[in-house]
Amino acid sequence: MDFEVYPDAMIVQTHRDPIRVIPSVAHLEYTMRLVSSDDVDPKRVGRQMLGVWAKLLNQGMESRTAHPEREARILDVSMREIVSDPVACVEKIYAYFDLPVSDEFRSRMHDYLDAHPKDEFGVHRYSLGAFGLEEEALNTAFKGYRERFNVTPEPYRN
């Protein structure tokens, strides 16, 4: 984010355990590549996604460390907060940035959530092994990220 271009930016950085994210993005990337090729190696895709996401998260942490003056304009939110109580999470975000939440807005959020229940479109399961990934490698690669943002490890389930 270029704060010089967007001086009034308010950032919500969401966090989820990479052991749940990496197989998902590897599956998405694998599927996208299949559109243009019949020769896609899922294990290669898995290694690439692990490398890309480790690099991106490390760069993000380095940027935040280098610019502590920006921290007041960044709110960290866990995926667990979002899923467990979406309305409270949105209210937390708005309160952090001193934005109003009207009763109508709150009501519309509840209406939307009632009309679109969790897992409305099914549940996706991804395998680390299908992408040549091992739980220990992910735990090692993302240890610093988990510690910095207090990301609770989610047990891997195939």
Q: In which residue ranges do the predicted regions lie?
A:
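ATP-dependent NMP and nucleoside kinases share a basic, alpha-helical "lid"
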Residues: 1-15
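PAPS-dependent sulfotransferases, especially Golgi type II membrane carbohydrate sulfotransferases
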Residues: 5, 22-158
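C-terminal, active-site-flanking charged/polar segments
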Residues: 11, 17, 97-101
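Short beta->alpha linker loops
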Residues: 16-17, 81
